[in-house]
């Protein structure tokens, strides 16, 4: 399988590279349009600031390339947010695959810390991306418990395939056509995250 990772100014790219290597896949790290288009699947990680990321992508027309990819794409963390329509972070227009805007967490009490950092559960699972898991509301041992670090979130919408509750319920995962996303870091979520990445690769076969 030819797995490509979008190369740009994002902070968690190499942890995704290492996650794939642990699964026996040597990914191609690239910002070349033709190489992304020819891959069997594309991973679009991100950790950092949305405006700077979009400026980098637009300068290389990678926003258009990503938007028009036909193979399975997995957006991770800021990668999920950049696939949305607009982000409050830097007040920037994003790639626009998902017709929803990214919002900043607004603490409601002293216990609410931003960024949201740590482990949390996934609810309302609705996709093959979560094959083999049961939603946390079912109280199952197989409910996904995954690692998050983020100050901005995607509201619940028609594309939501998993939800998480921190300050309010929000979309921790999205799906539309060939695009899948995780707000959390599967590459930092142990065996649970590895299984989610494996499910994505299986979708890509």
Regions found by a protein language model. Name each.
Residues 1-4, 178:
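Extreme N-terminal starter segment of soluble prokaryotic enzymes
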Residues 3-25, 186-188:
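N-terminal beta1-alpha1 ligand-phosphate binding loop
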Residues 68, 101-205:
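Amide-donor transfer/coupling interface in amidating biosynthetic enzymes
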Residues 48-118:
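Cysteine-nucleophile active-site neighborhood
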Residues 39:
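An anion/phosphate-binding loop that grips the pyrophosphate of nucleotide cofactors and donors
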Residues 43-45:
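Structural motif
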Residues 35-36, 65, 173:
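Structural alpha-helical scaffold elements that stabilize or flank donor/cofactor-binding regions
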């Amino acid at each position: 399988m030819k797995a490509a990772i979008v190369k740009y100014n994002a902070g968690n790219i190499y942890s995704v590279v290492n996650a794939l290597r642990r699964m026996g896949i040597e990914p191609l790290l690239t910002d070349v349009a033709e190489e992304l288009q020819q891959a069997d699947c594309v991973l679009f990680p991100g950790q950092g600031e949305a405006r700077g990321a979009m400026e980098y992508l637009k300068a290389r027309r990678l926003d258009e390339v990503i938007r028009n990819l036909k193979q399975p794409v997995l957006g991770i963390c800021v990668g999920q947010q950049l696939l949305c329509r607009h982000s409050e972070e830097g007040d920037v227009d994003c790639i626009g695959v998902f017709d929803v805007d990214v919002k900043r967490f607004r603490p409601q009490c002293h216990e609410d810390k931003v960024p949201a950092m740590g482990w949390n559960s996934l609810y309302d699972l609705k996709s093959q991306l979560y094959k083999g898991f049961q939603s946390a509301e079912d109280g199952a041992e197989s409910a996904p418990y995954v690692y998050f670090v983020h100050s901005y979130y995607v509201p619940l919408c028609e594309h939501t395939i998993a939800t998480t509750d921190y300050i309010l319920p929000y979309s921790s995962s999205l799906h539309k056509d060939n695009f899948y996303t995780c707000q959390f870091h599967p590459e930092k979520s142990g065996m649970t995250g590895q299984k989610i990445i494996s499910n994505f690769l299986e979708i890509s076969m």
